[in-house]
């Protein structure tokens, strides 16, 4: 005889409850139960009796409503408010686009075209720069300071621009970059938005509209560029300044890439190299993080609906904010945030929210908010892509050299003013692969055995090889140009964007290339928990090593 339905149901509930309590980490699906349709089943006797009894009005159940109130989303409201504000500015003709100027700078204008590595040509370009210290008579004390991705040329305050710079304490009398000894030059990179030619600049070859305020900007007509292209533009500036050779090429983060590239391109013009938290080739994790930022940005409707030509309308501030939040995660370290924020909430007295709630969330939200209109979105796309393309390995450098040679003829047309439209239209072509990469079922050992070439490449990039400081032969060949240049290579153990093995790789490759004057310093977590941003914050650790190395 079957058990009564109610008893069976209660037993199931009790059983499920006991299982959940005794196995708190394991999830169980509820036991199957019979589904009963109240419209088709006959009412039970008790139900029929109850149906005949009159219902007192006061006992009548009220209409069913949710007891849960919908959440509010002040973070999204803030984005809407910002968009509305920018729209009003556009309608009032007060200028919808933010000002990307970083204060008063010097400007160098090159009227000669520049050929870029991937076939693009800029018919002319500007470089914004600032200087500190005095250039001596024979112009032998110049140091070229290379910036990070989003930095301007304003590394230190000047009489024209008293606002503190991004390396304020690192530059000055007696500082690591001692202005009593050296003449420091810092530029905004080609492709940037702080005075140098970039996607937000006016395209001199485009047909201008009648209104001077609506002249055609490059936008995504701006050609793909590389770290080496940025360095070539900087050396064009040095030529104009009459500086034949640098005392040193110094840079951190993206600037650490450029400081190496400068010596690879012009080994006879660089006396010393300082690369802090940089790399000689971008690795997949950093490429993936920057790709994610670009995808978030390009999927902002303000960008995607205009395909990057948002300058006459609303800038993609929401995408920029989110991209910056992602970037900020890679700039700092987990241990620092554990100490600084932990799991604390901004206001424990309030219920949890889906908008920023934990202190770490409010920190990221603020980082994105304060930056979203400070930098041009297209500059972020182009400059970050240049970082991804960076590889000083011999094979890649030979490939770029071949591409440059095959496009050298374009300079003649641009110089003569006879460049054809179809030539200009093909300066930048991005194609997707026919078949996307798919996960393989094979094991690591099977993958290593798939081909000798893949096995060799895997061995060279394996953790064991990195720990043993065995750099790839391709990179050793690529860095041969630095074999006679004194080099300081610094890394930070807590850095996840440019992990410390990349700086060990640079130092090992330089030594294997024959360089006997390589100084490698790695700041452990006992000295810095600031991750990649250590180069901006650690005056004693980073600055002290630079001071000692420069002499």
UniProtKB/Swiss-Prot annotation:
Q: Kindly list the biological process annotations in GO that this record carries.
A: cysteine biosynthetic process from serine; homoserine metabolic process; methionine biosynthetic process; terpenoid biosynthetic process
> How is this protein annotated for GO cellular component?
mitochondrion
Q: Where is this region: Important for substrate specificity?
A: 148-151
Entry keyword set: Acyltransferase, Transferase
Q: Which InterPro entries match?
A: AB_hydrolase_1, AB_hydrolase_fold, HAT_MetX-like
User: Which residues are responsible for catalysis?
Assistant: 253, 495, 532
- The segments labelled Disordered in the record are 1-69, 434-464
For this chain, the family text in UniProt reads: Belongs to the AB hydrolase superfamily. MetX family.
What is the name of this protein?
Acetyltransferase efuC
The species is Hormonema carpetanum
Instruction: Write the gene name.
Output: efuC
